[in-house]
Swiss-Prot record:
Belongs to the sirtuin family. Class I subfamily. This is NAD-dependent protein deacetylase HST1. Keywords: Chromatin regulator, Metal-binding, NAD, Nucleus, Repressor, Sporulation, Transcription, Transcription regulation, Transferase, Zinc. InterPro entries: DHS-like_NAD/FAD-binding_dom, NAD-dep_histone_deAcase_SIR2_N, NAD-dep_sirtuin_deacylases, Sirtuin, Sirtuin_cat_small_dom_sf, Ssirtuin_cat_dom. The gene is HST1. GO terms for cellular component: histone deacetylase complex; nucleus; Set3 complex. It is found in: Nucleus. The keyword Ribonucleoprotein does not apply. Identified in the Set3C complex with HOS2, SIF2, SNT1, CPR1, HOS4/YIL112W and SET3. Its presence is however not essential for meiotic repression by the Set3C complex. Interacts with SUM1 and RFM1. The interaction with SUM1 is mediated by RFM1. It is an enzyme of class 2 (transferase).
Length: 503
């Protein structure tokens, strides 16, 4: 494979990517800019230390005949990603690759960008032709290869179909790098976070189920969560209980389990109060919550500062005439496993379903043969079901907020549901991003990961800032000490220190 083929690789990637992150034109790349995004000296353009030298020439083991991969560190990956973002694609490939390459080099570029192949057949083919050498540097491996060049060491060991797959995987890796922010190089400690928190004026807070689990509200997607508890219902997909089409056809599917997700009234966690504290200090730009429990309102977060991305139990509406009432008005129906019915559609419903005789229990509304949807005149909580559009307020506010925020804090969320999950890539790259969660979110690049229970992390941060959280448990929480263990650069495990036994 020679420089001509490498140019074809560039052309292929550019053409495949047309309309996404690159455009064709003299083999140049233009990254899509976010509107009015600031250019900042804090942007991640600082080159990191690396042992590798470029272009990297892969050596071959004279005994096994396998290509030898040098060790690729996290700094090497960051360096390559920064270079790709700062330069056009042609420059990137010419800098990191020698003039003559084979498909093994394409795989090396995929690894250098921090990715790997997923195709099992391709992975096995690569494995049979590659060995790693963690001790030798790129320069040493280069000298090994140079001695063997006369032996036609660059003959491609992979089949053509494998080479094509590798080129496509490299294109995907490049697209992923260009569409994802990189970590800020000088923001990776709790002290960096607290210093920024004290000075921030427009904090964007994105919350998920983890902020409510301390109150006994299940996280739908956890192993002990709601979805695992309703598998006995025999649904093909547990998420079907929140499917709009299924609700319209048979609302009893939802109302058979609605009591399990009914939020507690007038309760909220210390984490909710932490957000309220940010609001009271004039620091909160907006809290975007994916939760439907409406606990933010109980904590005192102003409606103007709150966007319930997936709706909530705060209100309920008739699916037929759209009459709306406060959500708490149907809580008793939910607890009694009853269908909450609209008084304005009730008489018509009785005509359509005479067998019910006005009875609104869930069981009596399951097996009607009427062509009219069983949801006629039924009140539905104004939460966003699968198949429904997000509330219009989300789209109206997020466009402005992502450009104004000076700090993003994601709390108790796995960021698996779009479009909310895309917020982290919409915020300007110079804005620090913090994750407070029980587990890592590996598909996003947070500058700081604080892993632990949300209430514990919020208490630790408040104490370090010398702030008081306006919650009834605060006096007890402020007495607790925490262990902060750095498990990786920018990643800390937060745990309560065990209390000393009184003698």
């Amino acid at each position: 494979m020679n420089i001509l083929l490498m140019q074809r690789i560039v052309s292929f990637i550019l053409v495949v990517s047309q309309g996404r992150y690159f455009h064709v034109g003299e083999l140049t790349m233009t990254m899509l800019k976010r509107p009015q995004e600031e250019e900042s000296d804090n942007n991640a353009t600082k080159k990191l230390k690396t042992r590798l030298t470029y272009p990297c020439i892969l050596g071959k083991d004279k005994v096994t005949g396998k290509f030898i991969f040098p060790a690729i560190t996290k700094d090497d990956v960051m360096n390559a990603r920064l270079f790709l973002k700062d330069n056009d694609l042609k420059t990137f490939l010419e800098y990191f690759l020698p003039v003559e390459v084979n498909s093994i080099y394409i795989y090396f570029m995929i690894k250098l960008l921090g990715f790997d192949v997923k195709d099992k057949e391709l992975f096995m083919a690569l494995n049979s032709n590659i060995t790693s050498n963690k001790e030798r540097s790129s320069a040493e491996l280069s000298s090994i290869h140079a001695k063997a060049e006369d032996e036609d060491e660059l003959t491609d060991p992979l089949e053509k179909k494998h080479a094509v797959k590798l080129i496509k995987d490299l294109q995907k890796a490049i697209n992923k790098v260009l569409s994802t922010r990189l970590r800020l190089p000088n923001f990776n400690t709790i002290d960096h976070f607290t210093a920024t928190l004290r000075n921030a004026k427009k904090i964007l807070v994105l919350t998920g189920a983890g902020v409510s689990t301390s109150l006994g509200i299940p996280d739908f997607r956890s192993s002990e969560g709601f979805y695992s508890k309703i598998r006995h219902l025999g649904l093909e997909d547990p998420q079907d209980v929140f499917n709009l089409d299924i609700f319209l056809q048979d609302p009893s599917v939802f109302y058979n389990i609605a009591h399990m997700v009914l939020p507690p009234e007038n309760m909220y966690s210390p984490l909710h109060s932490f957000i309220k504290m940010l609001q009271d200090k004039g620091k909160l730009l907006r809290n975007y919550t994916q939760n439907i429990d409406n606990l933010e309102s109980y904590a005192g977060i102003d409606p103007d500062k709150l966007v319930q991305c997936h709706g909530s139990f705060a209100t309920a509406s008739c699916v037929t005439c759209h009459w709306q009432i406060p959500g708490e008005k149907i809580f008793e129906n939910i607890r009694n496993l009853e269908l909450p019915l609209c008084p304005y559609c009730y008489q018509k419903r009785k005509q359509y379903f005479p067998m019910s005789n006005g009875n609104n229990t869930v069981q009596t509304n399951i097996n009607f043969n009427s062509p009219i949807l069983k949801s006629y005149g039924v009140l539905k909580p104004d939460m966003t079901f699968f198949g429904e559009a997000l509330p219009s307020r989300f789209h109206k506010t997020i466009r402005k907020d992502i450009l104004e925020c000076d700090l993003l804090i994601c709390i108790g969320t796995s960021l698996k549901v779009a479009p909310v999950s895309e917020i982290v890539n919409m915020v300007p790259s110079h804005v620090p991003q913090i994750l407070i969660n029980r587990d890592m979110v590996t598909h996003a690049e947070f500058d700081l990961n604080l892993l632990g229970f949300c209430d514990d992390v919020a208490s630790l941060v408040a104490k370090k800032c010398h702030w008081d959280i306006p919650h009834k448990k605060w006096q007890d929480l402020k007495k607790i000490d925490y262990n902060c263990t750095e498990i990786d650069k920018g990643t800390y495990k937060i745990k309560k220190q065990p209390r000393k036994k009184q003698q």
